[in-house]
């Protein structure tokens, strides 16, 4: 069986007009998939150069397949029918590593046709890294790398106003475009780059904030042999995603024409303010995911679909959404309920979305996706929302890394992995009790951005829930909340 490459699988190749920081599954099944559709159905005619922003050789480079790969988009469509659509993506031309091909990276700025920059460098990617310098080859942080590339562009074209870029970050942080722009300006000032460059940044470039929404299930490990047999070729970069997607971009109205959205209908909205869309999605879709994962996994389930077909776990999630999340959100209730109904429908997607793959960086996800609603509920009602509080206890229990005597991988930053290993070891040895363990976790101001032990009743309630999970098991402990 042949492996994908452009010699054996000839077809359209597009001039390079898009730089993409990030080679991961999400961008490939979201941005590159949409660009591919626009290339086919309009005269967008734009190829993507993927820049690998971190120093790693895993996964291998997309260039090993000449940028080609297959997306398999599947799930329930708008009519509730199960669909599956395989598409050979030709929008990506090549991948370069900013670490091993730094000169090639800078040369991207010399191409007059370059117009767009997309990125997904994870929720931690748009951040300041002290000590990044102009001469670093490369700097460590993504914003510093981008600043250097923009300066290369500015210098090469002598500050021409028609050579600026439209920069569209897809990282899951609030107002990601504004945050990225502020960091680029910070590096420009820190590196004492000329005032003319700072003016050019402002006048010639657009930093657009976005909301991205698609569940991307990635490489379908369990089904690869069957899928490759159906496709007739080997593809080391197979990428699976759900049918539903939404891309909301806060940017100039002219963007719709530039991206040819007026010529082919995609679920892309160009808006003046993404805030309401963001709050709805992060609180309901991401919040429900984050509440569901530690509860369902420790109840013995492995995928989102299994969890939604389990009467008790499904009831827990739906009650969390309708009784504890929606009431504290600032949008019309009917609009929120209709979005929530679409979300739970998407969760019933018959294709496997592994709970463990969503569990990545669970501590940060809880802080950004659930904590605001938990605190708002407590403030509004004077009582803690029972299910969101239970989800926090379940999350702490999840970091034991053991289910029914078997270990499972827990992925989070090193600080939390070490912290939990130490705390659970002390708990097992009866050095600390459950309430003390919970208090230590909730007192981590650097993480929570506040001292959660000061929230009335929170330590006690989380400790009670955690004791119930440890003594009775997840099924018994969660039952009263279903």
Curated annotation (Swiss-Prot):
It catalyses: D-altronate + NAD(+) = keto-D-tagaturonate + NADH + H(+). GO terms for cellular component: cytosol. Its EC number is 1.1.1.58. Pathway: Carbohydrate metabolism; pentose and glucuronate interconversion. SUPFAM superfamilies: 6-phosphogluconate dehydrogenase C-terminal domain-like (SSF48179), NAD(P)-binding Rossmann-fold domains (SSF51735). It holds the Pfam family Mannitol_dh_C. NAD(+) binds at residues 18-29. GO terms for molecular function: mannitol-1-phosphate 5-dehydrogenase activity; tagaturonate reductase activity. Keywords: NAD, Oxidoreductase. It comes from the Bacteria. Transmembrane segments: none annotated. GO terms for biological process: D-galacturonate catabolic process; mannitol catabolic process. It is an enzyme of class 1 (oxidoreductase). HAMAP family: Altron_oxidoreduct. Belongs to the mannitol dehydrogenase family. UxaB subfamily. This is Altronate oxidoreductase. It comes from Shigella sonnei (strain Ss046). The gene is uxaB.
